[in-house]
Amino acid sequence: MTTKEKNKSSNSPPPTSFSSLPDDIVLNCLARVSRFHYPTLSLVCKGFRSLLDSRELHATRSCIGKTESFLYVCLDLHRNCYPDCPPRWFIVSPITKQKLKPIPSVTCQSSTVVSIGSKIYIIGGFVDGHSSRRLIVLDCPSHGWRRLPEMRVPRQNAAADVINDKIYVIGGSSSNNIEDWGEVYDPKTQTWEPVLPTTLDLTVQMSVVPGSLVMSGKVYDMNGLKLNFQKNICLVEIENMMCQTKVCEGVLVWCEPEEDRGWCPVDGLEGLPNRPTSPGYLTSVAHSDRGRRVTVWWESAVLHRLGPKWTKECKTEIWCAEISFERRGVGKVCGFVEWSKNVFTKDDYKTYKLPASLSDFFLNSTIVTY
């Protein structure tokens, strides 16, 4: 390098760092980045973390039409090999990757999950061998958990829904006191108040599935004031009609709540890739796209190869597929695979054994839009 070039280089201004730009420009740039990357960006500096948590960023995203929906799931991946290993929370990455990204987790066995805006609330559950009164919130942009004021009574597998920006929680308690039937949480005041059966109008929630209560898309059988959670049933809107879907003996089935035809298989799913050879292989179904689609989940064993030979050890892959629906005449529903991928592979090898029955690793899920 010549002396002239050195002088020119030394006189050049230093490059402008992104963090030195005005906040309004930084906000406009961050608003165009997927929220999936926000937890990583929040580690850059305190200024970034403050902007990512700000209402201004949320307003900017809404203004330019950049709101996104994310599926959060809680999976018990080590239930057979490591019973003491707690379940983990994951976020499903956006198209086209569709991989499970682990996030900091809390236990949620028999808990109820609802979301408001960018926050996920974990209500009650089975903790340390007992029903719990806890309320924990996950801030999705930062993936940070914090405790909130506890419920009045312990509950597990309670029904919950968001009505007028308040969280109504019903059932799930062993108490026979009518004042413990339900309670409502106000996120603004962070207070709980009792809810009596005579003061809460559940006409809409009880009209979708006759004889049952529907809250947050989940179905609960009613026995007087007691509720029985019907696990693994999702309500889905198919051409302006609400139908129930569930996994029955490894097969995705559907029914119309007001018809007597019973449960029927969803057609068109025979071509799902990398499924086990047995006809019934699905383990769980969960909501997707705010009740218009579902995701189905299953496990697949991949044998380990050592040189030219296959061993008896295998890795377990977690597969997920998103399914949309279309009615085909009377009493027939066809499913369409929007995407299907291996979303997670367990690191540990284990000896392959044909399972005696399908093991349900899927514990909970919710969709967050913000």
Swiss-Prot record:
One Pfam family for this entry, by name?
Kelch_FKB95
Answer whether the UniProt record assigns the keyword Repeat to this protein: yes
> InterPro entries attached here?
F-box-like_dom_sf (IPR036047), F-box/kelch-repeat_ARATH (IPR050354), F-box_dom (IPR001810), Kelch-typ_b-propeller (IPR015915), Kelch_1 (IPR006652)
Segments annotated as Kelch repeats: 119-165, 167-212
What residue stretches are annotated with the F-box domain? 15-61
UniProt keyword terms in alphabetical order: Kelch repeat, Repeat
Looking up PROSITE patterns in the UniProt record yields: FBOX
Known SUPFAM superfamilies for this protein?
F-box domain, Kelch motif
For this protein, the record's CDD domains field holds: F-box_AtAFR-like (cd22152)
**What's the name of the protein?**
Putative F-box/kelch-repeat protein At3g46050
Source species: Arabidopsis thaliana (Mouse-ear cress)
